[in-house]
Amino acid sequence: ATFAFIILLWTLGGFNQDPFISETLSIQGEALSGSKLFKINCVGCHGISAQGLLGPDLHDATKELSDKKIINQVIKGLTPPMPSFEIDPQSMADLLAYMHSLNK
């Protein structure tokens, strides 16, 4: 029974959930603050309106990607030339809120 419980936790993500992601997802982000962060850090590649330049268009990105995948992309820079960013959970939650506001 213990082994089955461990397997269940593992498959549901109980053992492999990143604490940063968990904390970020537990915070209510502010889209206005996220917009300011975006303008400081992201417009060079994603454009002033997030329409895409060197980096992809981010409109509807939150419809296509989970918040967890977006967080990992930002903090790890998974697809070159995207750099990794050191960001605190509140700022990441704000950036996510801004990205959700870009949905058409």
Question: Model regions: which residues?
Answer:
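Post-cleavage N-terminal segment of exported redox proteins
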Residues: 1-29, 88, 100-104
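Intrinsically disordered, low-complexity segments enriched in polar/charged residues with Gly/Pro
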Residues: 14-17, 22-23, 44-45, 59, ...
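Sequence/structural segment immediately N-terminal to covalent heme-attachment motifs in c-type
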Residues: 26-51, 68, 72-76
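Extracytoplasmic electron-transfer domains, predominantly the class I c-type cytochrome c fold
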Residues: 49, 59-104
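Short cysteine/histidine-rich zinc-coordinating motifs and their immediately flanking basic loops
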Residues: 54-58
